[in-house]
Amino acid sequence: QAVLGAGLPCNTTTSPIIKVCASGMK
């Protein structure tokens, strides 16, 4: 489970959050 800089888990089905999470992972 990757974690976004804000502390939000990337493991979610919310498309917008996945987008932000993917950006944070890069």
UniProtKB/Swiss-Prot annotation:
What PTM annotation applies here?
Succinylation, adjacent to a coenzyme A binding site. Desuccinylated by SIRT5.
Which cellular component appears as one GO term in the record? mitochondrion
Q: Listed disulfide bonds for this chain?
A: none
Q: Which reaction does it catalyse?
A: 2 acetyl-CoA = acetoacetyl-CoA + CoA
The molecular function terms in GO held by this entry are:
acetyl-CoA C-acetyltransferase activity
Q: What is its EC number?
A: 2.3.1.9
Top EC class, one word? transferase
Its subcellular locations are: Mitochondrion
Please verify whether the record's keywords include DNA damage: no
Where in the sequence is the active site? C21 (acyl-thioester intermediate)
* Keywords per UniProt: Acyltransferase, Mitochondrion, Transferase
Reading the lineage from the top rank, the first entry is: Eukaryota
How this chain assembles, per its entry, is:
Homotetramer.
Q: Which family does it belong to?
A: Belongs to the thiolase-like superfamily. Thiolase family.
**What is the protein named?**
Acetyl-CoA acetyltransferase
